Amino acid sequence: MSSAPHPRVVMVGAVPMSGLVVEVPDPRAVIVAIHGGGTSAAYFDCPGHPRLSLLRSAASHGFTAIALDRPGYGASALYQDELMAPERRVELAVCAVDEIAPPGGRGAGVFLLAHSAGCDLAMRMAVDGFDTEVLGVELAGTGLSFQSRAKAVLSQATTARRPEGLRGLLWHPINLYPPELVTGGLSAPRAEYEFETTSNWAQRDFPAIAARVRVPVEVSVAEYESVWEATPTANAEVAEMFTASPRVVINEVAGAGHNLSVGLAADAYHQHVLSFVEECLIACKGMDVEVEAS
């Protein structure tokens, strides 16, 4: 089976859900990757740069990997009116994964990885979607408070208007990325519900959902993070929210900017994430042995 990702569209009721998929025989687990705002599943298979692809790296380690177009993106972009409730978005995403990689063929389970605005959906999937099948969660490009420059830019955002200076903010510093990406090579129209989810994320939804996560969590922070506060104190505050998680790791990624999975340091970042997945697999096996021995 080819390790090159291929597009998939599956129907969840009357709503088409799309994404990029790479499948391996007898997968050790399934990695589900959730992109951030204003992009698509292609974020995890960097166009023209296969070495930077999370999906290809995952397959080389024995994992099936699914990069979903979040509800409101890709094939579901025409169904915005159905997507305002977070419960509906979780239902669509989980059912899409079930169609692509049915339960019983996922190896040890599902590992969820998300970037930026995708963290809301991934964490909701972890606590309300897959139940006990979740091995762990990787979050990147998120936090609890905006940096001053980001606050100034994002304060201009409305439901109908992309704020001036947003691209420069998200892709700073530009020398850390392939040049074609900085000029919009991965851009996609934003989902209509994102203004609300972004507004409520740091103060309400992130802390509330984090407290319900019961699996290991890694939060990756770019050395040159340009959106969220990433001081040691800020990172510790994020980690402290995961009160029910057995393990929380803060991973500082050298030579990287906000868009970790498409920067020139993406391969190193992905290899680290895959090591964390390995640790989650070991922890899961340890729990199985303990249950069998008790």
Residue map of PLM features:
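Short, surface-exposed "cap/lid" segments of acyl-processing enzymes
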Residues: 26-60
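Conserved alpha/beta-hydrolase
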Residues: 51-77
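N-terminal cap/lid segment of alpha/beta-hydrolase-fold proteins
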Residues: 1-25
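Short beta-strand/loop motif that positions the catalytic acidic residue
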Residues: 213, 219-221
